[in-house]
Amino acid sequence: MTTLTLLQLNDLHGYLEPHPELVRTEGGWRFERLGGVARIARLFEEARAEGACLTLDNGDTFHGTRVAVASRGEALVPIMNALKIDAMTAHWEFAYGPAGFKALAAGLDYPVL
């Protein structure tokens, strides 16, 4: 039997570096440093080295941080292309309007479904 691993990314919100997030644990709520595109890339590479993967971005990627909003998402396009995503859905990406959304999608190396 062939195994296919699904890799999912969502709600990046333009955060390229690890950042504090409030996380609920058994002991209550606490802040932890999460995320970071370099860390995500490493995890994706490790999974791909083990076998076939389908990598999906579920959106909320190109909007949120200063760099994302100031560039209307464009600054993140080459970074996201480097992650070798297979396909994406969108959510806040529509905040840049139809033309902005189309421009982002045109720059990606993968389809926006």
Model-derived features: positions:
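Acidic, metal/ion-coordinating pockets
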Residues: 1-113
